[in-house]
């Protein structure tokens, strides 16, 4: 992987990730394909929304279908018929989410399968092996997602163990002679000093990119912004910056303003299935009875298949009847909305009009433009 940085405006960056399987324009949003599929969508449909890269879930693909079946197909690209770049998370966040059915030790994580209750052990080495079998273009280190709230001492212990796991991930990745890219994950909770220590340790080990982890786990939005404002300028400028698991459209806008290059989140797909649709004027709740006889398009500024062909009344009808097509059309729209947002951000950075773009983004939804501190490096 090669990261090319074209231009900046403030801390916002316009560039691209160049892989053998294709180029990813940044800032980029990665749709989430947990089980090797973006729910309800064919790979071709996902590509048509403008996606250059997908995120796969190491933990779930390890449990089902497993490494053996994956290797029989070649890798995840062949298994799901997506011949463009794939980033896989390490499984650390999913283990974190298991709560009471997992036990974390220095060696790794003991837990019971959420599928059948079987006892399972996952450690940095195994995570690297699984991601190797998936053929991931971007592999994420195995880490512990520091919970919120956590005391500074708790966050320090968690972060320091994640650093040790980062070294083990690096060593196993190299032992496997994996030709792809490995990203480190910065932890440290809401404590700036711990974030500094984490980043320094990761840079000393050496990675192809750096993710900001442990955010969007319940902390106030102000804390997320503060950590990004503090951390992003310290990440080596020639490496991509990835904000994991974020988020709402405004989170992407605010992340880009603070120097983030990559995002992923289940929000556009999950919200689509629940009838919450993102538009240029805000969220439309298609289940609301006001849409029952509305012949207008969902968003007249959107060029997606759904908006070009169907009315709000039809989408309301499909949802009320629990038709699968409704969820599919909603998903197509939400994914295209996110990709159009990223296209707009990239274009605004290129032309030096990011401030105008941000103002229009918020005012078109009847919202105030949030203040951003003077961002000087």
From Swiss-Prot:
One of its GO terms (cellular component) is cytosol. It comes from Shewanella piezotolerans (strain WP3 / JCM 13877). Its cofactor is Zn(2+). The active site is at residues 89, 264. Catalyzes the base-exchange of a guanine (G) residue with the queuine precursor 7-aminomethyl-7-deazaguanine (PreQ1) at position 34 (anticodon wobble position) in tRNAs with GU(N) anticodons (tRNA-Asp, -Asn, -His and -Tyr). Catalysis occurs through a double-displacement mechanism. The nucleophile active site attacks the C1' of nucleotide 34 to detach the guanine base from the RNA, forming a covalent enzyme-RNA intermediate. The proton acceptor active site deprotonates the incoming PreQ1, allowing a nucleophilic attack on the C1' of the ribose to form the product. Binds 1 zinc ion per subunit. Belongs to the queuine tRNA-ribosyltransferase family. Zn(2+) binds at residues 302, 304, 307, 333. This is Queuine tRNA-ribosyltransferase. GO terms for biological process: queuosine biosynthetic process; tRNA wobble guanine modification; tRNA-guanine transglycosylation. Residues 245-251, 269-273 are annotated as: RNA binding. InterPro entries: ArchSynthase1/Queuine_TRR, TGT, TGT-like_sf, tRNA_ribo_trans-like. The keyword Glycosyltransferase applies. Substrate binds at residues 89-93, 143, 187, 214. GO terms for molecular function: metal ion binding; tRNA-guanosine(34) queuine transglycosylase activity. Its EC number is 2.4.2.29. It catalyses: 7-aminomethyl-7-carbaguanine + guanosine(34) in tRNA = 7-aminomethyl-7-carbaguanosine(34) in tRNA + guanine. PANTHER family: QUEUINE TRNA-RIBOSYLTRANSFERASE. Homodimer. Within each dimer, one monomer is responsible for RNA recognition and catalysis, while the other monomer binds to the replacement base PreQ1. Gene3D superfamilies: Queuine tRNA-ribosyltransferase-like. The keyword Lipid biosynthesis does not apply.
């Amino acid at each position: 992987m090669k990261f090319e940085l074209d231009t900046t405006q403030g801390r916002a960056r316009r560039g691209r990730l160049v892989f053998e399987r294709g180029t990813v324009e940044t800032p980029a949003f990665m749709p989430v394909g947990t089980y090797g599929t973006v729910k309800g969508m064919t790979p071709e449909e996902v590509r048509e929304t403008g996606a250059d890269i997908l995120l796969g879930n190491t933990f779930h693909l390890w449990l089902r279908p497993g490494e053996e079946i994956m290797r029989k197909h070649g890798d995840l690209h062949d298994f799901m018929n997506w011949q463009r770049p794939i980033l896989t998370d390490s499984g650390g966040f999913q283990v974190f989410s298991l709560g009471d059915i997992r036990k974390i030790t220095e060696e790794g994580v003991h837990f019971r399968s959420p599928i059948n209750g079987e006892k399972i052990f996952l450690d940095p080495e195994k995570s690297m092996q699984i991601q190797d079998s998936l053929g991931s273009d971007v592999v994420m280190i195995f880490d512990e997602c520091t919970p919120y709230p956590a005391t500074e001492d708790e966050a320090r212990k968690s972060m320091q163990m994640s650093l040790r796991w980062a070294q083990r991930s690096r060593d196993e990745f190299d032992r496997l002679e994996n030709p792809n890219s490995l990203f480190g994950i910065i932890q440290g909770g809401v404590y700036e000093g711990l974030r500094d220590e984490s980043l320094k340790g990761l840079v000393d080990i050496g990675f192809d990119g750096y993710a900001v982890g442990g955010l969007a786990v319940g902390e106030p939005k102000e804390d997320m912004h503060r950590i990004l404002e503090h951390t992003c300028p310290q990440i080596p400028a020639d490496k991509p910056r990835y904000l994991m698991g974020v988020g709402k459209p405004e989170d992407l806008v605010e992340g880009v303003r603070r120097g983030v290059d990559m995002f992923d989140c289940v929000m556009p797909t999950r919200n689509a299935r629940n009838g919450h649709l993102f538009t240029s004027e805000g969220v439309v709740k298609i289940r609301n009875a006001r849409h029952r006889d509305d012949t207008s398009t969902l968003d007249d500024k959107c060029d997606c298949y759904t908006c070009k062909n169907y009315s709000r009344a039809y989408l309301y009808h499909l949802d009320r009847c629990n038709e699968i097509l409704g969820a599919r059309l909603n998903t197509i729209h939400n994914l295209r909305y996110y990709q159009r947002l990223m296209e707009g951000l990239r274009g605004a950075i290129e032309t030096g009009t990011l401030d105008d773009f941000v103002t229009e983004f918020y005012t078109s939804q009847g919202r105030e433009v949030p203040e951003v501190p003077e961002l000087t490096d």
